[in-house]
Every structure is written in C-alpha cells, then in structure tokens.
C-alpha cells in the first residue's frame, strides 16, 4: 500500500499493522469524562469528501453558535489523498485534511462533532477520538453506520436509543434521531463522557437525521450548496 506519511503520524512506517498498533497505544490517552463547559459558546462540525476521482481529500469545517446552532464560519481544506480506504483506519486517510480545516477557523470551538466513529471502533480509537487526542479538543463521533459492537434496535421515535456493546463494555449509542430513519452511531471521542456524547447530540438535533454540526459539514464536504452564515452571533 502506497502512503504519504503526514507529520501528525510521526513514527508510523505506513503499514496497516503499525497503524493499528498506534491506535491501540493512543487509545490509552482518551479521556471519557465531561470536560465541556456547561455553557459553551462555539461548536464545530467536520466532515470529509473527495475530489478528482479520490485524488484530493476535501475537509469541511463549520463553526456554529452553540445557542442558536446557526453557522458562523465555514472553511474547506484540500490536501492530496495519502492512502486508500482501509476499514478502521479512517483517521490515517482523513485526519491531515481535518487538521488543516481546523487551522482555518478564526476561533477555537469548545466542542467538536466529527462525521465518523469516536470509541465505537474495534480498537476504541476512531477518527473522532484520534482528532480529540491530537488537538486536545472535546470531541464526539456521529457515524451513519456501525463499525463495531452490537445493539438492540432502538424504538422508532426521535430520541429513542440503546447502548452499543463490544466485549461486554459499552462503546456508544444507537440513536434514533428521526422517525423512519436508521439510527445514528454516537460515541464519545475525547474529553466527553458516554452520557455526554448522547446528550450533546440530542441537544444539537433539529428537523434532520444528523445533528446540525455534522449536517452542515456534510453538506459543505459533499458540495451540496452554500451555507448562509449568521452575521451577528448570539452572545452567551
């Protein structure tokens, strides 16, 4: 497998085996406790798409007012795609672009939502956990599909949820965010508790399946239209 090693992965030899080993090591740094302000001012959503037949990784960042959930900033970062998709190693493919997008924000978010897994991952170190450990920012993973673990299908109403278990331990939540839609896979990434990940995701839901931070980032990453910014943010 041909890879271009980003400085954020210093010490990685580019192999799948060592990438998995690094995940297991870095997973020990994940903090599953709530370290988010009770009244955060800024949230951010991140998602990734691809251009040029997959040769370019396109990372979208959207900064939102935490009270109104209206967007304040949007940015897109583009970097050459460094490696092919390997299940469970998404961060080694997408994290360099996400960090570039984060650097474009004029203000630092208090809490970050990533389109992808937090600790709901075979080695409990998905892209939201990796992002959080590298940046130090509280993070939550919100994925559209399950990667690891099992769960009982939650009820059909908005807000219904059930725990996702792996080897007898909870790694996330299956959350029915919208009736007649498949559940989201929600899990803490870093500096957020299991319950906190669920609560914050519920707080940021509106009329759509995805919470506003990742919904807007998904829209920007997939080039489905411009996002109108809130020009006068609410002061908390």
UniProtKB/Swiss-Prot annotation:
Listed name of the protein: Endonuclease V
Catalytic activity: Endonucleolytic cleavage at apurinic or apyrimidinic sites to products with a 5'-phosphate
Subcellular location as annotated: Cytoplasm
Site (Interaction with target DNA): 85
GO biological process: DNA repair
Pfam families cross-referenced by the UniProt entry: Endonuclease_5 (PF04493)
Chain segments annotated as coiled-coil in the UniProt record: none
Keyword DNA damage: yes
Taxonomic placement: Bacteria, Pseudomonadati, Pseudomonadota, Gammaproteobacteria, Lysobacterales
A molecular function (GO) term: RNA endonuclease activity, producing 5'-phosphomonoesters
Family assignment from sequence similarity: Belongs to the endonuclease V family.
UniProt KW keywords: Cytoplasm, DNA damage, DNA repair, Endonuclease, Hydrolase, Magnesium, Metal-binding, Nuclease
Residues annotated for Mg(2+) binding in this entry: 47, 115
GO CC annotation: cytoplasm
Job description of the protein: DNA repair enzyme involved in the repair of deaminated bases. Selectively cleaves double-stranded DNA at the second phosphodiester bond 3' to a deoxyinosine leaving behind the intact lesion on the nicked DNA.
EC number per UniProt: 3.1.21.7
Cofactor(s) named in the record: Mg(2+)
Signal peptide: none
Gene source species: Xanthomonas campestris pv. campestris (strain ATCC 33913 / DSM 3586 / NCPPB 528 / LMG 568 / P 25)
HAMAP family assigned to the protein according to its UniProt record, in alphabetical order: Endonuclease_5
